[in-house]
Amino acid sequence: MPRRRVVAKREILPDPKHGSQILAKFINHVMVSGKKSVAESIVYNALNTVAARAKTEEPMAIFEKALESIQPMVEVKSRRVGGATYQVPVEVRPARRAALSMRWLVDASRKRGEKSMALRLAGEILDAAENKGSAVKKREDVHRMAEANKAFSHYRF
């Protein structure tokens, strides 16, 4: 953390196809070893698959609904008090909420069994939009952990 001035947030350019900043950020999360064109093709193919499977809704709406269903409201942070380490529940900032949901969606997709990453990602997006799947389970686990440690919430940061 800088001591003098606050570092300005960098502006993320919207993705070329849908014009969405959220999707551009998500493409960056999917990207491995700087291969952005590969990540873009994976995400766009996944959205095309989502559009084919769910004919009624717009694929971007399903994607945003999926991210919304994964976002955690509270998480636990370790706080050391007199030799004991407590897991203290804290509220999650909106920017971190979005980043965690994207990270969990990509991680859950990578662990799935479908053939290509685009199919895995599409499957996980559809599952998350219906409040099921590994990414939603991860959010539930984080919430459960925060609920279990509610007694330590007075050790605020």
From Swiss-Prot:
Pfam families reported in the protein's UniProt record: Ribosomal_S7
PROSITE patterns: RIBOSOMAL_S7
GO molecular function per UniProt: rRNA binding; structural constituent of ribosome; tRNA binding
Keywords: Ribonucleoprotein, Ribosomal protein, RNA-binding, rRNA-binding, tRNA-binding
GO CC terms, sorted: small ribosomal subunit
GO biological-process terms attached to the record: translation
The family this protein is said to belong to: Belongs to the universal ribosomal protein uS7 family.
Protein task: One of the primary rRNA binding proteins, it binds directly to 16S rRNA where it nucleates assembly of the head domain of the 30S subunit. Is located at the subunit interface close to the decoding center, probably blocks exit of the E-site tRNA.
Record's subunit section: Part of the 30S ribosomal subunit. Contacts proteins S9 and S11.
Name of the protein described by the UniProt record: Small ribosomal subunit protein uS7
Source organism (scientific name): Marinomonas sp. (strain MWYL1)
